[in-house]
């Protein structure tokens, strides 16, 4: 964050700064730290020693460009070279070489990595910080039991608890408990040292009986007792060196390593002065923790809040990459040690070059980026999605929580989240509260804590100083929240201001304030900060809006929002989709795919993105915004990207909306739209789909790409070139051949022609035939071929498959079934497209574009859409754009309503349109029915809100099937569009059919159309040749499955025919 000339003004930090800082910290410090841990490796005879020289490592510039790595499915990485030495102790000679130890994936300008052609991003993880935490729980008798939990750097736990008799026990990983004296003795302390280093020696002596004295009589006895309890072994184990090593490895090294963060936290909590480089648990730590636990028992000290952010740490991209690099070096160490032993055994002369291989490092990073839960494919639906994805925080992942076991208390909002984690932006569903988003100004500190900035208020100095505070520090300050000074420092300070102190919200005098906020919505994430009038919305609807903005599809003709918040420009710039001038100069040439400009004494060519596919099949494209001969300055926008206009984020369109019912077509949030949105391409978007095919070498020979495909119609092959690949610019429909391919296979003996049999009998020649395995365009894939990539793997091996990728562009207008949404959680499905002349129209004759259901506003409590709607109408008439800061009620009561009404009044005056602002019902207007011309009975709210078209489109979801695959067990249709699934009539579907009075079709629904194998085959044949469909005689497969399952429970199910006569006789006898 940079300060300007005015010391109270500052810029918002770059939104992708979290990723860049983390990766730079890994390159600058993480690599050196892990390389310095690499040990010296000796052979068994200690004649040869191998070591790495950390000071001289280097990363080489990548050999390929980012764009080529994406198209050719390669990894954009850098080669790591380190100096290594091989020392011959007997000869006192050293051989030093610079060796290549592997590739490290690099981070590009978007803050992402390209691995195997995919943009991947590593999100940060929230973990419980290592240290000690005290809490109180009630036992089954309702008595408080105090416990202290020591959490290691790897997540292992050691619990200390004090019972009703003030006896202290240690419990390792919830196993059997042992006395604190036994644990301390096993760690090397005798009874005298224990009593000298505790504050309450009399309590320790109180539960020291003869049995306990025997256990701690010597270190060996204590270790045996501890090993017996820790490993849960029976009998009487015998003390030995191997037992000590096992205990040292399993417990003291794995479960007692605190790390630097844990050592720092433990020193602060227990008032210790142990050096921070001593990262293992010591006897002093155990005894100090026990002292504090005794103090809690007698009412001294405070308990810890486990959900406070001061007790959490952020595992950033730097930490995750450093852990993987350390794991790779451990594997490399084992490999080098085995290679040295093998070379000595076979009497070979090793060199540093042939001792080291790049496989451990390269495979470790590829496995991490491909399989780790925190490494995700970058969501590139729109620019906002890209930038928000890298700012996510997750409680999930290795060492963290799971969605099914996390409690409500962990998911809830905590006061320490203020300015650090957004209280609104989280995922919906099972992971709610477990995946959050960083606030705008939050940053990750050196110790893994989340920091947020404040302005310090000092009476002695008039200068304003900015401080970044961790969650443990801002508890001791009175922090003024939401004061008007955050935007306008000229306003006189109020006498009474709201403030936050020690996790409580108070109202105090201004003289008592220590710190104040620097931004009106610094506690929100990017997604929530883009919602205008967010203070008038329910938090649940704001959450939905934050998520739905990330699902907006870039439109072919984007438009800036009339009502915004002011962050749209920075989001667009930091997302990297726009081309920005790095220095000043003059434009020499510009066209659709490049910009050439000169400056600083040289000429530079900037390629523009043209029809690039995102992983959500949206179209990424850049459009030049400068002209030839124009002079530009540093930081100026050269080309707009997808969903940006003039360097600002533009996700949707400002359309004319009326809130009114219309013939039931907006029932349950459905949306009625005008055909103008189709004919004028208002909500038209381009989508690019990728289809690929591989050629392999089979046992009968290699597969061939060719345009000579036998037994196929000529119309299906008309778009192929001489190589058998579809031509650029071709228009293709469903079923067309994109790539012609023949797979060789051996023909059956009966299918040989007589001459083939003669050749085979005389010369032994095997006659092969080919099977057509072409790449065909699937259902719903019509469009224009915009790109074809034929990727041939380097090396010339015939076993490396060739990959052919065909990219097809689709133009999609808005249609019935598409999902649209506003920025206030108001979402709906398009239910009907009306002609323009039938839509309701205003008093100036203009028909509205959309009709929303007014019942969706009061119950959802998202009134912000009404403010935006009316202010947007005023802005469109006055040709103005508004940037509204949230929580403007702090300046004046009813500030939002006064602003909207004043703008509407001014618009009605300037345009001489009194219907824009009518004092009887301000914000509403009388509109007319397009079908009859009669006015509606009630005035209607009309306006111009910003409406988005979401990626949930009917073209991707609609699905039909006549026959297809069936489940093997139940013989019922599979589920899902991807599997060509069908409908499964279950219990509730049967109830629905019965309830609607169509029970007579249940038999065919449950037999022919479901799981009666023979009946559905007969139906298919009868339908083709004509005739009467036979009735099924036996039971369907699901009933057979029920019978088998009952038999597995030793229950036999039989059926008998009972006549009515016998039934009556049996009743009389009874």
UniProtKB/Swiss-Prot annotation:
Assembly and oligomerization: In plastids the minimal PEP RNA polymerase catalytic core is composed of four subunits: alpha, beta, beta', and beta''. When a (nuclear-encoded) sigma factor is associated with the core the holoenzyme is formed, which can initiate transcription.
Family recorded in the similarity comment: Belongs to the RNA polymerase beta chain family.
Keywords noted in UniProt: Chloroplast, DNA-directed RNA polymerase, Nucleotidyltransferase, Plastid, Transcription, Transferase
Gene Ontology terms for molecular function: DNA binding; DNA-directed RNA polymerase activity; ribonucleoside binding
Protein name from the UniProt record: DNA-directed RNA polymerase subunit beta
Native organism taxonomy: Eukaryota, Viridiplantae, Streptophyta, Embryophyta, Tracheophyta
One Gene Ontology cellular component: mitochondrion
Pfam families: RNA_pol_Rpb2_2, RNA_pol_Rpb2_3, RNA_pol_Rpb2_6, RNA_pol_Rpb2_7
Source organism, top-level taxon: Eukaryota
Annotated function: DNA-dependent RNA polymerase catalyzes the transcription of DNA into RNA using the four ribonucleoside triphosphates as substrates.
Reaction(s) catalysed by this chain's protein: RNA(n) + a ribonucleoside 5'-triphosphate = RNA(n+1) + diphosphate
Compartment annotation: Plastid, Chloroplast
Record EC number: 2.7.7.6
Gene3D superfamilies for the chain: 2.40.50.100, 2.40.50.150, 3.90.1100.10, DNA-directed RNA polymerase, beta subunit, external 1 domain (2.30.150.10), DNA-directed RNA polymerase, subunit 2, domain 6 (2.40.270.10), RNA polymerase alpha subunit dimerisation domain (3.90.1800.10), RNA polymerase Rpb2, domain 2 (3.90.1110.10)
One biological process term in Gene Ontology: DNA-templated transcription
